[in-house]
UniProtKB/Swiss-Prot annotation:
SS bond list: 231-239
Maturation propeptide residues: 249-274
Residues with glycosylation annotation: 22, 36, 151, 223, 248
Lipidation (GPI-anchor amidated asparagine): 248
Gene name as annotated: MSP2
UniProt organism field: Plasmodium falciparum (isolate kf1916)
Name of protein: Merozoite surface protein 2
Length: 274
């Protein structure tokens, strides 16, 4: 009799411990699955967009290249604006050589003033010398006037070329004071070219840092908030999946408890009657 009682008690404890282990396993697995599903949904909804900083930097680079192009255009316009003056001077002096004979004068608006003045001054003079042998003195005077205009235009071109040509090594060695002046003149241009990049850089950096900090701080709290919003906003499907798993685990736990109570009653009844 005592042996049966002890065996029944041992079986009861074994059964209880087995049911408790099974209950803990089922409950843990269901809870973990529900938590993982909620985390995956919240992560899928809170993916931050990428590729914002790159476009800003590209825009700043395009602005720098546009400013460089405008500088070249200004130099070209300055050169073209200075040379037509010499062409106008050369062409204004040519009508003095025209006589009663009809001569065609062609004026070309090129950058070289020598070609325009030579073509417009030499050809009419030869025609005048052949057709008017009597007026040689006038032709000589006109030739002298044309030579003076050519010399003036050549001097202007030389001055322009000297101003445009960079200083050679001999000039640098002879005048050491020219180098610091050139460095000072080049410094403000470098500052001007760097200024648009500096103006556009802090905005891009600020937005990039703000986006990264915002994403890193709000990843974890958004998980819980999104899982709560799914149930509160009326998304019954998402909320139902989580609650169904939890309800299944609770039902299994209640069934295990009921089985344990029944087995305990049976063991006690056998022990009492025996």
């Amino acid at each position: 009799m005592k042996v049966i009682k002890t065996l029944s008690i041992i079986n009861f404890f074994i059964f209880v411990t087995f049911n408790i282990k099974n209950e803990s396993k089922y409950s843990n697995t269901f809870i973990n699955n529900a938590y993982n599903m909620s985390i995956r949904r919240s992560m899928a909804e809170s993916k931050p967009p990428t590729g914002t900083g790159a476009s800003g930097s590209a825009g700043s680079g395009a602005g720098a290249s546009g400013s460089a192009g405008s500088g070249d255009g200004a130099v070209a316009s300055a050169r073209n604006g200075a040379n037509p003056g010499a062409d106008a001077e050369g062409s204004s002096s040519t009508p003095a050589t025209t006589t009663t004979t009809t001569t065609t004068t062609t004026t070309t608006t090129t950058n070289d003033a020598e070609a325009s003045t030579s073509t417009s001054s030499e050809n009419p003079n030869h025609n005048n010398a052949e057709t008017n042998p009597k007026g040689k003195g006038e032709v000589q005077k006109s030739n002298q006037a044309n030579k003076e205009t050519q010399n003036n235009s050549n001097v202007q071109q030389d001055s322009q070329t000297k101003s445009n040509v960079p200083p050679t090594q001999d000039a640098d060695t002879k005048s050491p004071t020219a180098q610091p002046e050139q460095a000072e003149n080049s410094a403000p241009t470098a500052e001007q070219t760097e200024s648009p990049e500096l103006q556009s850089a802090p905005e891009n950096k600020g937005t990039g840092q703000h986006g990264h900090m915002h994403g890193s701080r709000n990843n974890h709290p958004q998980n819980t908030s999104d899982s709560q919003k799914e149930c509160t906003d009326g998304n019954k499907e998402n909320c139902g999946a989580v609650t169904s798993l939890l309800s299944n685990s609770s039902n299994i736990a209640s069934i295990n408890k009921f089985v344990v109570l029944i087995s305990a009653k049976l063991v006690l009844s056998f022990a009492i009657f025996i």
